[in-house]
Amino acid sequence: MMKSYEIDFKEIFGSNYEYKFFSPGRINLIGEHIDYNGGHVLPIAINLGIYALVSKRRDKSFAFFSDNYFEMGIIKTNNFDYAKNDGFANYPKAVIRSMLDSGISFPFGLNIYFYSTISEQAGLSSGACIEVLTATVLNEIYKLNLTSFELAMRCHKAQSEYLQLNSGIMDQCAISLARENNALFLDNYMLNYEYIPYDLGDYSIVVCQTNKPSQKVNSKYKQRVRECQRALDIIKNNFNVLTLTKIPKEYLEMIENLLPDNKLYRRVLHVVTEEERVLKSYEALKEHDIDTFALQINASHESLRDNYDVSSSELNKIVELARNEQGCIAARMTGAGFGGCALALVHNDFLVEFKENMAKKYFDETGIHGAFFEVSACGGPRRLPKDTESLSDAIASLVQYAIDSHLIEEEDRIYTTNRILAYLNLDYIDEGTSHPEPLYMILDTIINYAANMGIIENTPEAKDAFDATIMNVFVPRPSAIIREFYSISEKSSTKALEYLYNISLSSNYI
């Protein structure tokens, strides 16, 4: 059963939380390892990420707690320099330090409880996610009025200067600037960006998580950065180029003769060709040309594996298995590599079969339980309503939907509201405001609350069952439905069938 983070917060910090925030993770569709080489990238923010529950403190200290690092307990500090023993807390500390060094002051401290729906080892940018989340918390609570781009830049400074992680700006921008149902076409050299509609037609992106993280990813990443810089320094002595991604493809043969070894040339070869693949993907997505996009994805993996040497045996195996599955037209590793995850482009008709087959075959081949899930392009970091506020509105909206759909009468409003509260283990809730949202969105709020509070298990099966339980509040007993059906059928069998269809549709049964 899922724990109640709301209850945990009170037990850990001794008070109720006042604010709730969310920041998405990100996945890069294409453009790997060229952000720090001044290239273009095509990331999306995804519908998984990190949440923060926050309350104000009476002193100026900041206290951090992460459900992912429960054993570390509360990390309370007013010293925001890097400290190895502070672990995950160095990410929010670095953001705070970056803000302080820019002249921003914080008149009071905060208690911040982090919990995540993404694995740190998945390669979905959990570090940048917690940075942007922290910056969003500070921006909102202290009313700093910083733009999304400014937040991204401050987070990148925190990561590069205070955490000494030399990377491009992609991760922070992909998260902070995210727009729902759009990909971000980002120029890492000019710092320009453009939104393009994320519409894959009959296809979806499935994340294929190897669950085999590398213990040396940071050192290997830094080595690639150094190799690229060394190659660029040599090339600059002979060609007027500013970054590796600006090298024309026709120069590659001449450049191969300039570089002292084949390894450096292969690094340059990947960077130059990956930039070309991003530009082709950009045009393909705008034209809804999925086949061309798929070709770029596949070629990207080959280059990352053979030229940039950042793949792994598990990544190669998961990509190989994915490409052999019916409905999958492309797959590649994504992220820094050396472990982490891949992405697959899969036809919607084969999603269930794909995930089931991949889970079995990957385990059979590696002995590792992988994880396979679809992702969609979501919006950026934001403040969320407190659980009870959004819940009361959802209940009010659901009851109003039932009245409008003629499932219940106006006189049944209080009775049905109380029945729903009983299923949620609540005796009372403040009266909410109904909103004309789609039924699935209303139900999602109620069902996710039940999972969050440990009322139901956080599984698709348990959520589906609870969906049916809630909607049954509005449905007459089977005996009453049968009587009504036979009564109508005496006049018209067609109308009797319409009655069954309409009540099934309105009650979310079909």
What are these regions (language model features)?
Residues M1-R26, I30, Y51-N90, L100, ...:
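C-terminal nucleotide
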Residues Y17, D35-H40, T77-N85, S116-L124, ...:
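A short glycine/serine-rich beta->alpha loop
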Residues G38-A45, R224-V225:
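Short Gly/aromatic-enriched secondary-structure transition segments
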Residues A45-N47, L124-L144, L343-V346:
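DPxDG-like acidic metal-binding loop motif
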Residues I96-S119:
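Glycine- and acidic-rich phosphate- and metal-coordinating loops
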Residues D101-G109, L138-R154, H347-K361, E365-T366:
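Phosphate-handling active-site elements
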Residues N145-Y193, A331-T334:
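Alpha/beta catalytic cores of group-transfer enzymes, especially the acyltransferase/condensing modules
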